[in-house]
Amino acid sequence: MSAVLTPAGFTDYKVADISLADWGRKELIIAESEMPALMGLRRKYAASQPLKGAKILGCIHMTIQTGVLIETLTALGAEVRWSSCNIFSTQDQAAAAIAAAGIPVFAWKGETEEEYEWCIEQTILKDGKPWDANMVLDDGGDLTEILHKKYPQMLERIHGITEETTTGVHRLLDMLKAGTLKVPAINVNDAVTKSKNDNKYGCRHSLNDAIKRGTDHLLSGKQALVIGYGDVGKGSAQSLRQEGMIVKVSEIDPICAMQACMDGFELVSPYKNGINDGTESSVDAALLGKIDLIVTTTGNVNVCDAGMLKALKKRAVVCNIGHFDNEIDTAFMRKNWAWEEVKPQVHKIHRTGAGQFDPTNDDYLILLAEGRLVNLGNATGHPSRIMDGSFANQVLAQIFLFEQKFADLPAEKKAERLTVEVLPKKLDEEVALEMVKGFGGVVTQLTKQQAEYIGVTVEGPFKPDTYRY
C-alpha cells in the first residue's frame, strides 16, 4: 500500500487510522459507479456551482456512500465539516479517505458516547470557535438539537436543515410545534426516492446481511418477530422471509397491520390481547418463548421492553434497525443482567443476574450492536445503489434551501418560512429518473394528448401530492 498523505499542514480531523485512506479511496471509486443519480447531479451542476458559499455541518453515518455524498457537495462548491450520527456506523476506511482529501471529519467506529458528542462539537467548532456555518445536514436530529441548545447564536446564519430520518423528522416537528425551531427544514426522509428505497428496499438488503455476519446463524426455518410494519418494517420482514424464516409482525397502526396481513405475515402482539398494562403478566410469554429472533423497526421507545426480554426464548437474537438504542430496553439489561462480549457489537446477555455469570449457562440472549442500528453496527449498511436516491435528495434539498437564503430575510418574513416540508415532487422525480437511467431503464413519455387527459404536463410532476406510492 502506498503512503497516505493529507494536504500539507492539514490536521483538522480525527479518524481511527489515516493509513486506511487508500483502501477507502478504492471503495469510493467503486461506489461512484453504483450511484448514478448522485454522480449525475455532480456532472449536471458542476459548472453552475450552486453550493458555492455554502458551509455545511454534516452529521450522518460516515460510510463509503457518505463519502460520495460529501465529495459531491464539495464538487458543487460547498465547504463541509463532518461527523457520524451513530457510534458504531463509521467505516474507518471511508473516514480516512475523506480526511486524506483534506476534508474535516471526526468519526471512527466504536466511539463512546462522550467521544460521539466530542466529534459533533469538533464539526461545530473550528480552531476552538464556532464555525460560520450556514447549512445543516443531519440524521436523527442530534446535531440540530446541540445547535439549538448550546450554540443558538449560530442559527442566525443558517439557511436551513435537511433531515435524513424518521426519528429526526419527528424531533423537528416537535420543535416546530413547540415554537423552538429557529430555521426551516426539508424532510428528506419522506421523499419517495428515500423512504421507498432506503427504508424499505435498503433494509430488505441489509438486515439479514447484518444478522448473518454477527451470528453466523442459519435463519431458515426459525421464527422471527418484526416489531413495526412501516417502510423499515416492511423491508425487514421481506429480508427475513427471503432467508426462509417464519415471520410474524407486531403493529399498533391498523392500516400497517392490514398491510402485514395482506402481505401474508401473521399479525401478533407480544402482549395478551394486544394490551400492555405495564405488568409482566400482560406479556404473551407463550408467543415470545418460541421466537428465535426479534427486530425492532419503529423509531419509538421500549417497543421491546423488559418483560418481553425476560420472556424471549433462550439464545434468541435481539436487534434494532429503527434508530436509537432505546427501542430495546438496553438500560434494563445493563442494570440487571451480565454482558459478555463475544466480538465487537455482539454480546451474550446472561439473564441470570448482574455481575458474574456462568459461561456454561444457556439462558442468554444474543444482542447485536448494543441495540443500535444493526445493519451499520454488524455490517456496512445499505448498498450504494440504495443510498444513491437518499443522498441525491440530500444534495437537491441542500441546494433548494441554500438558494432560499432564509438567514438573509428580514425578521418579519422569517416566521412564515419556518416550516418542515418534503422535497418538491418534481425534484423527487428528477432523482428517480436518474436512478432508472442507472439501471438502463427507459421511461415512456406521455403524449400531449395523454398529459392533458389526466391533467398533468408532459414534463411532470405526474402524481398529486396526496398519491401514495
Swiss-Prot record:
It is an enzyme of class 3 (hydrolase). Its EC number is 3.13.2.1. CDD domains: SAHH. Substrate binds at T63, D139, E164, K194, D198. It comes from the Bacteria. Binds 1 NAD(+) per subunit. PROSITE patterns: ADOHCYASE_1 (PS00738), ADOHCYASE_2 (PS00739). GO terms for molecular function: adenosylhomocysteinase activity. It catalyses: S-adenosyl-L-homocysteine + H2O = L-homocysteine + adenosine. SUPFAM superfamilies: Formate/glycerate dehydrogenase catalytic domain-like, NAD(P)-binding Rossmann-fold domains. NAD(+) binds at residues 165-167, 199, 228-233, 251, 300, 321-323, 375. Its cofactor is NAD(+). It is found in: Cytoplasm. NCBIfam families: ahcY (TIGR00936), PRK05476.2-3 (NF004005). HAMAP family: AdoHcyase (MF_00563). This is Adenosylhomocysteinase. It comes from Ectopseudomonas mendocina (strain ymp).
